[in-house]
């Protein structure tokens, strides 16, 4: 059988692509080296932020607004356990923060619902938060967080119900191109398709070593917290920048545990074996202490944590482009630790590519040619 589309990597983007392409009537094969959702990539750990007024640059805003529409649609499949939780996101940092300036600019350009608070206003709204006098907060009332593993599980189930073929726990070992399309090699045999999507995450260079993607080991952890820090008490998700420039992110507490991680830093790795479990690097359990001590002093001890991997591009912007010399293969990689919120729209973009549809978005900033 020759498929219309083969998807290599069925984590966040691949799961979405499999669903949207199958829903569009294509004959699709989803593949993954493991059984998604799993612990080997970048999507585990229960939750991921979704922010609309984007501190990484306004080029992302049209994408994230479409992503939000698709997340809302997906959430309707799980109304008892919603995939998207509109908790709001408070972005904290010094008044001269470049990141916050980008957030404010994005909000102004796209007329997003963002409220600016000074230090006293932040602490009056959320007494659990402490910030210096020179800090400001930009509160995105319509943003929140996503249940990442539930989202992937839902997409995979919906795709399967729609007739999508799925080959999991079976790594793709090679990709070949010829006049007839794309062929992948696996331990289960060879499979052919007219087109392919490569969204293999951290270890995409095992297949395409020429790509400018660097895996980085990252950790996040859950800390003891009480009901004051919960969604029920209107405690928001958050990003926070310390005076030294370190960037943190976190979520409202669930079951008396608040999850937090540090966005920058981490350990450069070159193989999956180097991504050692949480606590095997001395700094893992204390990485969030500078933020917690200064901004959330009421949070208790570290309960447990996990390690994941970022697939960083050189400029930490996404790579969305066809494979050089092969216009029938789309790459979606280099998501650099801020990609999950876009998984829905990136999956839709992949499905449009498979149908020869022109994208509704300007993807020029994400081309590989910027690294030449």
Curated annotation (Swiss-Prot):
Residue list for modification S-8alpha-FAD cysteine: 308
Positions contributing to FAD binding: 4-34
Entry annotated with the keyword Oxidoreductase: yes
Its EC number(s): 1.5.3.-
GO cellular component entries: cytosol
GO molecular function: flavin adenine dinucleotide binding; N-methyl-L-amino-acid oxidase activity; sarcosine oxidase activity
Annotated SUPFAM superfamilies: FAD-linked reductases, C-terminal domain, FAD/NAD(P)-binding domain
Catalysis: reaction(s): N(alpha)-methyl-L-tryptophan + O2 + H2O = L-tryptophan + formaldehyde + H2O2
Cofactor: FAD
Cofactor note: Binds 1 FAD per subunit.
Keywords: FAD, Flavoprotein, Oxidoreductase
Family statement: Belongs to the MSOX/MTOX family. MTOX subfamily.
Complex and partners: Monomer.
Functional summary from the UniProt entry: Catalyzes the oxidative demethylation of N-methyl-L-tryptophan.
Protein name: N-methyl-L-tryptophan oxidase
Organism expressing this protein natively: Escherichia coli O9:H4 (strain HS)
Organism ancestry: Bacteria, Pseudomonadati, Pseudomonadota, Gammaproteobacteria, Enterobacterales
């Amino acid at each position: 059988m020759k498929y219309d589309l083969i998807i290599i990597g069925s984590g966040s983007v691949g799961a979405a692509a499999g669903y949207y392409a199958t829903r569009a009537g294509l004959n699709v094969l989803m593949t993954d080296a493991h059984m998604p959702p799993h612990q080997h990539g970048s999507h585990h750990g229960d939750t991921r932020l979704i922010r609309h007024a984007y501190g990484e640059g306004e080029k992302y805003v049209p994408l994230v607004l479409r992503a939000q529409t698709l997340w809302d649609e997906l959430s309707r499949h799980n109304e008892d356990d919603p995939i998207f939780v509109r908790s709001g996101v408070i972005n904290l940092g010094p008044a001269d923060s470049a990141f916050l300036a980008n957030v404010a600019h994005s909000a102004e350009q796209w007329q997003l619902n963002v409220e600016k608070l000074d230090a006293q206003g932040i602490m009056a709204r959320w007494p659990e938060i402490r910030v210096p006098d020179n800090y400001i907060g930009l509160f995105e009332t319509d943003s929140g967080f996503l249940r990442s593993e539930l989202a992937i599980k839902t997409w995979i189930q919906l795709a399967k119900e729609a007739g999508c073929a799925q080959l999991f726990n079976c790594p793709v070992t090679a990709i070949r191109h010829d006049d007839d399309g794309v062929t992948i090699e696996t331990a289960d045999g060879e499979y052919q398709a007219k087109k392919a999507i490569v969204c293999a995450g951290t270890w995409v260079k095992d297949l395409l070593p020429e790509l400018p993607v660097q895996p980085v080991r990252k950790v996040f952890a859950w800390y003891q917290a009480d009901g004051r820090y919960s969604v029920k008490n209107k405690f928001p998700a958050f990003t926070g920048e310390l005076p030294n420039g370190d960037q943190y992110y976190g979520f409202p507490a669930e079951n008396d545990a608040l999850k937090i991680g540090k966005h920058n830093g981490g350990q450069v790795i070159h193989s999956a074996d180097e991504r050692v479990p949480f606590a095997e690097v001395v700094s893992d359990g204390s990485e969030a202490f500078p933020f917690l001590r200064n901004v959330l002093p009421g949070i208790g001890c570290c309960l447990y944590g996990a390690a994941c991997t970022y697939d960083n591009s050189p400029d930490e912007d996404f790579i969305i482009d066809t494979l050089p010399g092969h216009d029938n293969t789309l790459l979606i990689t280099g998501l650099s630790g801020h990609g999950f919120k876009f998984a829905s729209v990136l999956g839709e973009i992949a499905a449009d590519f498979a149908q020869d549809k022109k994208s509704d978005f300007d993807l020029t900033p994400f081309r590989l040619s910027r690294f030449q």
